Amino acid sequence: RGLRLVMDMVVNHTSDEHPWFLASRSSRNSPYRDYYYWRPGKGDNPPNNWSSFFTPCAWKYDTITKEWYLHCFGENQPDLNWENPAVREEIYRMINWWLDRGVDGIRIDVVSLFAKNIDFPNATLRTSNYDGYVFPIEHIAFQPKLPGYLRELNARCLAGKDRVSIGEATFVTTGNANTIVGEDMLDMVFQFELMELGNGEEKWEPHPYDIAAFKKTVCAWQRALDWNALFWGNHDQPRAVSRFQCETPELRARCAKMLAGALYCLRGTPFLYQGEELGMTNYPFSHESELRDIESIAFLHYEQQHDNAAYAWNGIRSKGRDNARTPMQWNVEPHAGFTCGTPWIPVNPNYPQLNAEQQARDPASVLAFYRRLLALRQSSEALRDGSFLPLHAPCDEVFAYERR
């Protein structure tokens, strides 16, 4: 069918059960010690005031070696030390192992965080979100050594090969994207400015969507990069139709088609997340037993401790990562036809009314629209390779552009 395979590479961190980490924590003299960031504490406290994406503190104390290790995500996800050439060699060897077996490209997880400020100063740029801890964006994102790491990765793994590289770039902006995208670095980046338009000061805080900000953001990225990665959702984002509060039966299909047409006719490569082509919606979470995402669970526990459970549940239902991780809705059979066993996470209860089998028979369905839209992109030279020109609309609520 002409399919190609792009493989996800998570090389910012490993599991705390990985052999490297087990060896690293076995002794301060282990040859794997510097595969991770280990630092002594300040008395009984961690090395600095950094928070992580998922926990109040970005450091975890190890009772074996009496030091702290850095984890920018969950405490069971210790960060790899990209300063160590041996770590980079291990990563390049692994990537080449897959490329040599025919993988057509790589999607690199949180690529913007590979380089850290290894002086580990206290974070001050943001306000404290968790009991005095501060997220250290100024010390972990887009650090000076990052472009050099990506050039080295390109030279060791990708140069001279017909392979694509896409970086998931947390905190990327139109101002810094070109420091990691280019002929000798990455081909594309996933940027999240469109995803974050509905956020307040932090992810969980609601904020009304602004069509003017939407148009400004789209046009800025179309100008900033010659080629963009176009997407409405992934495994970390809520479902697109729910994000824009269009999940009612009357609006869902129309909204899903509108979002697809608005984004996937832009200049760039469309990336579709499973279920998007059906207009799948968020899950109506109401109990902790339904949650699997460590970020959502940590957020719920923190807010419960501060008597803000209602705020937490509103945030989880609207923005929690589990919304995108419910099983694909294939048909009306039990578990939406996804499995004859028990799925790891519950199936959205709306699957009898929203599934692939029904939409495949309906020429007016969201699925049918996606098929026509992608066929149009394939057949139209203007949509495949043409330029982007924003058009002035007679009213603010209209987003219009021209491809030629």
Outline where the language-model segments fall.
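Active-site and adjacent substrate-binding regions of carbohydrate-active enzymes
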Residues: 1-404
